[in-house]
Protein backbone atom coordinates (compact mmCIF):
# COMPACT_ATOMS: atom_id res chain seq x y z
CA UNK A 1 0.00 0.00 0.00
CA UNK A 2 1.24 3.47 -0.88
CA UNK A 3 1.78 5.81 2.08
CA UNK A 4 -0.61 8.74 2.37
CA UNK A 5 2.14 11.33 2.02
CA UNK A 6 3.43 9.85 -1.25
CA UNK A 7 -0.01 9.80 -2.83
CA UNK A 8 -0.81 13.35 -1.73
CA UNK A 9 2.56 14.63 -2.92
CA UNK A 10 1.93 13.05 -6.33
CA UNK A 11 -1.54 14.62 -6.43
CA UNK A 12 -0.07 18.02 -5.50
CA UNK A 13 2.60 17.74 -8.20
CA UNK A 14 -0.02 16.87 -10.80
CA UNK A 15 -2.24 19.74 -9.63
CA UNK A 16 0.62 22.25 -9.89
CA UNK A 17 1.53 20.87 -13.32
CA UNK A 18 -2.04 21.37 -14.53
CA UNK A 19 -2.25 24.84 -12.99
CA UNK A 20 1.02 25.81 -14.65
CA UNK A 21 -0.29 24.55 -17.98
CA UNK A 22 -3.44 26.63 -17.58
CA UNK A 23 -1.59 29.80 -16.63
CA UNK A 24 1.27 29.67 -19.13
CA UNK A 25 -0.46 28.42 -22.28
CA UNK A 26 -2.82 30.74 -24.16
CA UNK A 27 -4.24 28.01 -26.38
CA UNK A 28 -7.73 26.97 -25.28
CA UNK A 29 -7.08 23.27 -25.95
CA UNK A 30 -4.03 23.21 -23.70
CA UNK A 31 -5.94 25.12 -21.04
CA UNK A 32 -8.64 22.44 -21.11
CA UNK A 33 -5.97 19.74 -20.80
CA UNK A 34 -4.49 21.55 -17.80
CA UNK A 35 -7.92 21.71 -16.20
CA UNK A 36 -8.41 17.97 -16.78
CA UNK A 37 -5.06 17.27 -15.11
CA UNK A 38 -6.12 19.39 -12.12
CA UNK A 39 -9.45 17.56 -11.78
CA UNK A 40 -7.71 14.18 -11.98
CA UNK A 41 -5.16 15.28 -9.37
CA UNK A 42 -7.91 16.19 -6.94
CA UNK A 43 -9.66 12.89 -7.65
CA UNK A 44 -6.39 11.06 -6.95
CA UNK A 45 -6.14 12.84 -3.60
CA UNK A 46 -9.67 11.69 -2.72
CA UNK A 47 -8.88 8.07 -3.62
CA UNK A 48 -5.60 8.06 -1.69
CA UNK A 49 -7.22 9.59 1.40
CA UNK A 50 -10.17 7.20 1.22
CA UNK A 51 -7.82 4.25 0.90
CA UNK A 52 -5.75 5.43 3.85
CA UNK A 53 -8.73 5.80 6.17
CA UNK A 54 -10.49 2.71 4.86
CA UNK A 55 -13.63 4.43 3.62
CA UNK A 56 -15.33 4.15 0.26
CA UNK A 57 -15.97 7.90 0.19
CA UNK A 58 -12.80 8.45 -1.84
CA UNK A 59 -14.03 6.21 -4.64
CA UNK A 60 -17.44 7.90 -4.62
CA UNK A 61 -15.79 11.30 -4.93
CA UNK A 62 -13.64 9.93 -7.75
CA UNK A 63 -16.76 8.90 -9.69
CA UNK A 64 -18.19 12.38 -9.09
CA UNK A 65 -14.94 13.99 -10.29
CA UNK A 66 -14.88 11.85 -13.45
CA UNK A 67 -18.49 12.83 -14.16
CA UNK A 68 -17.62 16.48 -13.63
CA UNK A 69 -14.58 16.15 -15.90
CA UNK A 70 -16.68 14.58 -18.66
CA UNK A 71 -19.22 17.39 -18.49
CA UNK A 72 -16.46 20.00 -18.43
CA UNK A 73 -14.73 18.40 -21.40
CA UNK A 74 -17.87 18.27 -23.50
CA UNK A 75 -18.79 21.91 -22.80
CA UNK A 76 -15.20 23.04 -23.23
CA UNK A 77 -14.79 21.25 -26.55
CA UNK A 78 -18.07 22.70 -27.80
CA UNK A 79 -16.83 26.19 -26.94
CA UNK A 80 -13.49 25.37 -28.55
CA UNK A 81 -15.18 24.34 -31.80
CA UNK A 82 -17.30 27.50 -31.88
CA UNK A 83 -14.25 29.67 -31.24
CA UNK A 84 -12.33 27.94 -34.01
CA UNK A 85 -15.22 28.29 -36.47
CA UNK A 86 -15.75 31.99 -35.78
CA UNK A 87 -12.20 33.25 -35.23
CA UNK A 88 -10.05 30.60 -36.98
CA UNK A 89 -7.82 30.49 -33.92
CA UNK A 90 -7.67 28.80 -30.54
CA UNK A 91 -5.90 31.72 -28.86
CA UNK A 92 -7.84 32.76 -25.77
CA UNK A 93 -6.69 36.38 -26.09
CA UNK A 94 -8.64 36.77 -29.33
CA UNK A 95 -11.88 36.25 -27.41
CA UNK A 96 -11.21 39.17 -25.08
CA UNK A 97 -10.59 41.64 -27.92
CA UNK A 98 -13.42 44.09 -28.49
CA UNK A 99 -14.83 44.41 -31.99
CA UNK A 100 -17.13 47.26 -32.82
From Swiss-Prot:
Its main location: membrane. InterPro entries: NADH_UbQ_OxRdtase_chain4L/K, NUOK/Mnh_C1-like. It is a multi-pass membrane protein. GO terms for biological process: ATP synthesis coupled electron transport. It is found in: Cell inner membrane. It catalyses: a quinone + NADH + 5 H(+)(in) = a quinol + NAD(+) + 4 H(+)(out). The chain crosses the membrane at residues 4-24, 28-48, 60-80. It comes from the Bacteria. Keywords: Cell inner membrane, Cell membrane, Membrane, NAD, Quinone, Translocase, Transmembrane, Transmembrane helix, Transport, Ubiquinone. Its EC number is 7.1.1.-. GO terms for cellular component: NADH dehydrogenase complex; plasma membrane. One of its GO terms (molecular function) is quinone binding. It is an enzyme of class 7 (translocase). NDH-1 is composed of 13 different subunits. Subunits NuoA, H, J, K, L, M, N constitute the membrane sector of the complex. Belongs to the complex I subunit 4L family. NDH-1 shuttles electrons from NADH, via FMN and iron-sulfur (Fe-S) centers, to quinones in the respiratory chain. The immediate electron acceptor for the enzyme in this species is believed to be ubiquinone. Couples the redox reaction to proton translocation (for every two electrons transferred, four hydrogen ions are translocated across the cytoplasmic membrane), and thus conserves the redox energy in a proton gradient. This is NADH-quinone oxidoreductase subunit K.
Amino acid sequence: MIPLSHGLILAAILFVLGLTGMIIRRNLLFMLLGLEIMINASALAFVVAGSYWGHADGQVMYILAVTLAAAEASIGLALLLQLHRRRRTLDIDSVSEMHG
